Amino acid sequence: MGDAGSERSKAPSLPPRCPCGFWGSSKTMNLCSKCFADFQKKQPDDDSTPSTSNSQSDLFSEETTSDNNNTSVTTPTLSPSQQSLPTELNVTSPSEEECGPCTDTAHVSLITPTKRSCGADSQSESEASPVKRPRLVENPERPEESGRSKQKSRRRCFQCQTKLELVQQELGSCRCGYVFCMLHRLPEQHDCTFDHMGRGREEAIMKMVKLDRKVGRSCQRIGEGCS
């Protein structure tokens, strides 16, 4: 009687639940019938996928090993050329550094005499210019003066030998030293040898107003001079 009471007092054990929410059984790996059927269908696919993944991993490993081998083979061929480049640069760099100041000094030595020669030429031109100007003015006058004879009488025109009155003698006298009539008194009419334009420039320069150096530099208030 006691055993029967104890069995009755025990609660019946509940079956396990499937992840989907239904009741499962120990025979079906604690899954319901539907989930167990789906699980069985997926088993062959799961078995095939690891095999393919393993094959892909094997191929990838083979490719990586081949790449590593290629790099290991090519690296020693490149290393000598890479090492030779810095040596060539190191060899050429001092030559350029040494030639730099040499070229600078050469340029300086070539430029300095040209500057001196230009200065000497400018000085020689400046010294010769004032000497040449009067020569150019005097040279055309000398042959004409030597070719022209002196005027014997100032009462007659040197060009046409017409008689002149006293007023005509004063009006017809030219700066070249000859006397002409009213028809030949202008410089263009008797081929005058005197440089009237140069003379006019000199007179204009002499008549120019020379400004004092103090103008515009000293300031003075209005009324200071008167006080």
Curated annotation (Swiss-Prot):
GO terms for molecular function: DNA binding; zinc ion binding. InterPro entries: AN1-like_Znf, AN1_A20_ZnFinger, Znf_A20, Znf_AN1. Residues 41-151 are annotated as: Disordered. A zinc finger (A20-type) spans 12-44. Coiled coil: none annotated. PROSITE patterns: ZF_A20, ZF_AN1. Keywords: Metal-binding, Zinc, Zinc-finger. Zn(2+) 1 binds at C18, C20, C32, C35. A zinc finger (AN1-type) spans 151-200. Zn(2+) 2 binds at C157, C160, C181, H184. The keyword Cell cycle does not apply. Residues 49-59, 66-77 have a biased composition (Low complexity). Residues 135-148 have a biased composition (Basic and acidic residues). Zn(2+) 3 binds at C174, C176, H190, C192. PANTHER family: AN1-TYPE ZINC FINGER PROTEIN, AN1-TYPE ZINC FINGER PROTEIN 3. This is AN1-type zinc finger protein 3. It comes from Rattus norvegicus. The lineage of its organism: Eukaryota, Metazoa, Chordata, Craniata, Vertebrata.
